Amino acid sequence: MNGALGNSSASVSGGEGAGGPAPFLVKTYEMVDDSSTDQIVSWSANNNSFIVWNHAEFSRLLLPTYFKHNNFSSFIRQLNTYGFRKIDPERWEFLNDDFIKDQKHLLKNIHRRKPIHSHSHPPASSTDQERAVLQEQMDKLSREKAAIEAKLLKFKQQKVVAKHQFEEMTEHVDDMENRQKKLLNFLETAIRNPTFVKNFGKKVEQLDISAYNKKRRLPEVEQSKPPSEDSHLDNSSGSSRRESGNIFHQNFSNKLRLELSPADSDMNMVSHSIQSSNEEGASPKGILSGGDPNTTLTKREGLPFAPEALELADTGTCPRRLLLNDNTRVETLQQRLTSSEETDGSFSCHLNLTLASAPLPDKTASQIAKTTLKSQELNFNSIETSASEKNRGRQEIAVGGSQANAAPPARVNDVFWEQFLTERPGSSDNEEASSTYRGNPYEEQEEKRNGSMMLRNTKNIEQLTL
């Protein structure tokens, strides 16, 4: 048996050198063709296949002798590699078309099959694709990690800055609280000091806060009601209006009394013209009870206006007037003039106060009194003689009151008015007062109204000039 194995080995080596069949095929052919091992492996009845009868003994005895291993499964895989196939499912019978008994030369036609990598290549390609996908995902995750780390670093820096700002704000708030506490402590200490309170009160009293509390009076047009014979007062205005009118009448009566005193005989007499506005639709700033804007202007500017010479003229009634009958006497008017601060009514007629820029001649107290009484007598004589004309004039005023505002009448040149309104060279104080008086827009409107009244009262004016 050893000699047979030696011969087979020599033939195999010779076949390999001459390019014969594969050593596995030669060894298998010799192992099957050995008759001494027919109980383990032998040819089939057709001599074109071989049968392994006992695979356990085959693995234990024959495989280590020919192939140096005892793995039956590995032997079967090798058979499959060279094209052998199992033909009987019940036993281990293998067949190859060129593996036939007594035809050993056909073994050179059996070739080893090339390994088919159809099953191995797809896993390799899929592995590469998966590896590429995984690598791409890893790169993406790395980029996201870097961005997150940058944001985290930025947030840490912002946290440090915010913490610093918070500390500064806390210090600032603490400083403000300390200042407030110090201020409150100082105020408590100062209030307890009577000297400080006294000095503070003096400072407050010295402050001129009247300018902040002043309110400008808006023009208010009062609608006068037709006077009745039974009534003596026109109560169209309210209580506040009456109080201001009473105060003004008191001041006006005091001025009138001072003019008649001898102490004021040497002072310049300046007169203002105050006319009624209810019957002609004028602003209440020019009426007697509401206050003269020129008088207010001279009071604010502090011009040294002297007490004025007063003349009585029948130019209309005031907004709040006392009704006089045609048989009213001079004594009744004088009594009302002297007691105007005690009564709530106004004069039955306006006092025309005209401004003279030049100083009037010096008169004694007796001359002033005589002149005033003479003017009063002349005025009331004119009132008695022109009672009917006044009634007619009131009706015309009531009908044409709106026309006076729409088309102001032309100014009438008269010798009596020109001697007072014409500017004369005189003292600088009177010139300053005259310029201030002429620059007032209320005076221009009143002059226009004076012109319309002068047209209706020309006869009375002529009597006054006599």
Curated annotation (Swiss-Prot):
A motif (Bipartite nuclear localization signal) lies at residues 198-217. Keywords: Activator, Cytoplasm, DNA-binding, Nucleus, Phosphoprotein, Stress response, Transcription, Transcription regulation. A motif (Nuclear export signal) lies at residues 461-466. Exhibits temperature-dependent phosphorylation. Residues 425-438, 455-466 have a biased composition (Polar residues). The keyword DNA-binding applies. SUPFAM superfamilies: Winged helix' DNA-binding domain. Residues 218-233 have a biased composition (Basic and acidic residues). PROSITE patterns: HSF_DOMAIN. InterPro entries: HSF_DNA-bd, WH-like_DNA-bd_sf, WH_DNA-bd_sf. Its main location: cytoplasm. It is found in: Cytoplasm; Nucleus. Residues 125-191 are annotated as: Hydrophobic repeat HR-A/B. It comes from the Eukaryota. GO terms for molecular function: DNA-binding transcription factor activity; sequence-specific DNA binding. A motif (AHA) lies at residues 414-423. Residues 21-115 bind DNA. The keyword Phosphoprotein applies. GO terms for cellular component: cytoplasm; nucleus. Homotrimer. Transcriptional activator that specifically binds DNA sequence 5'-AGAAnnTTCT-3' known as heat shock promoter elements (HSE). The hydrophobic-rich region (HR-A/B) corresponds to the oligomerization domain. AHA motif is a transcriptional activator element. This is Heat stress transcription factor A-5. It comes from Arabidopsis thaliana (Mouse-ear cress).
